[in-house]
């Protein structure tokens, strides 16, 4: 077994259950998605086919439709209930195509997509980022663009450290360092990747509220090595005592959000008219 594996069926169940109340609980996701969309506006790019990978309830795909009114839009998600929410949100006019599946094995043809837009999804399929990004590269056209956000390694650090003081089991998902993400993009064939980080802080009145908020957005522990069973009152008390608390009695949660983008190499003709793939 790998050092850290994600339980795909558990991820799907988590987001299937979270779909109904997702918009009310996922303020952070909505904020990050909005920022990524704003950054996309600054790029001089006119894609014909756009894939919203990990569409959730459709915030991204609705805005992408406004930004690229002539593009074919595809909303992709692991959870069917999320896609149903997306369909309702998108309305009847120019409804996007809906695809349900695993991002590691996209049901799309080679060189078929101009833009992959993905906000806070990659962390749920991050065991082998080179393989994941290689799959994205497969479906992207030459000169295609990958624009994404994902959680960085310092996400939920307070909760992780508190659990480490309680026992040695896996209670918190592992997130990947920004530099490793950039290296994986290069290894998968993307050129000139650009990476940066934003930090978001949320505060709660108790550790129970912290864990409830994480679960409500579908982001609780989904590692195959995760601790099983219900948490007893004594363990919860130990966790609360180990969790750093401010003088005002507030429990902070850090989210490190990594923003990334990378282009596929262009195809340029030789003098004889033969096209070759340029890797710079």
Where on the chain are the PLM-derived regions?
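Conserved alpha-helix/loop element of class I SAM-dependent methyltransferases that forms part
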Residues: 27-48, 63
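A short SAM/SAH-binding and catalytic strip from SAM-dependent methyltransferases
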Residues: 114-128
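A short glycine-rich, Lys/Arg-flanked "PGG" loop and its adjoining helix->strand segment in the class I
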Residues: 130-142
């Amino acid at each position: 077994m790998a050092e850290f594996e994600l339980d795909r069926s558990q991820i799907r169940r988590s987001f299937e259950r979270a779909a109904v109340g997702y918009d009310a609980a996922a303020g952070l996701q909505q904020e990050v998605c909005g920022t990524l969309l704003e950054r996309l506006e600054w790029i001089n790019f006119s894609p014909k086919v756009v894939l919203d990978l990990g569409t959730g309830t459709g915030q991204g795909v609705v805005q992408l439709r406004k930004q690229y009114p002539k593009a074919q839009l595809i909303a992709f998600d692991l959870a069917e209930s999320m896609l149903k929410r997306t369909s309702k949100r998108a309305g009847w006019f120019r409804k996007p195509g809906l695809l349900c599946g695993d991002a590691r094995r996209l049901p799309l043809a080679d060189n078929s997509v101009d833009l992959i837009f993905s906000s806070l999804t990659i962390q749920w399929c991050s065991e082998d980022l080179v393989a994941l990004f290689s799959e994205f590269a497969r479906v992207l056209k030459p000169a295609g663009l990958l624009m994404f956000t994902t959680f960085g390694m310092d996400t939920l650090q307070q909760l992780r450290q508190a659990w480490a003081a309680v026992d040695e089991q896996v209670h918190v998902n592992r997130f990947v360092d920004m530099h490793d993400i950039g290296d994986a993009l290069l290894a998968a064939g993307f050129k000139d990747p650009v990476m940066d980080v934003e930090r978001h802080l949320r505060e709660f009145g108790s550790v129970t509220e912290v864990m409830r908020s994480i679960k409500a957005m579908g982001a609780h522990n989904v590692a195959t090595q995760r601790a099983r069973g219900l948490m007893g009152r004594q363990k919860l008390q130990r966790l609360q005592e180990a969790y750093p608390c401010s003088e005002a009695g507030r429990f902070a949660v850090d989210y490190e959000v990594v923003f990334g983008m990378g282009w596929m190499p262009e195809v340029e003709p030789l003098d004889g008219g033969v096209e070759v793939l340029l890797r710079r």
